[in-house]
Amino acid sequence: MSQAPMATTPRNYPIFTVRWLALHTLGIPTVFFLGALAAMQFIRR
């Protein structure tokens, strides 16, 4: 991901904001769900 030349133009910040929003709305519940599944493996007796 060579995005260094694109960072010089100040018009690209909504694109990065939407990408950040999409990655975190999908990524944070996924990591939380995988952590919950991993925790359930240790809780099971």
From Swiss-Prot:
It comes from Synechococcus sp. (strain CC9902). Its main location: membrane. SUPFAM superfamilies: Cytochrome b559 subunits. Belongs to the PsbE/PsbF family. Pfam families: Cytochrom_B559 (PF00283). The gene is psbF. It is found in: Cellular thylakoid membrane. With its partner (PsbE) binds heme. PSII binds additional chlorophylls, carotenoids and specific lipids. The chain crosses the membrane at residues 20-36. The lineage of its organism: Bacteria, Bacillati, Cyanobacteriota, Cyanophyceae, Synechococcales. This is Cytochrome b559 subunit beta. GO terms for biological process: photosynthetic electron transport chain.
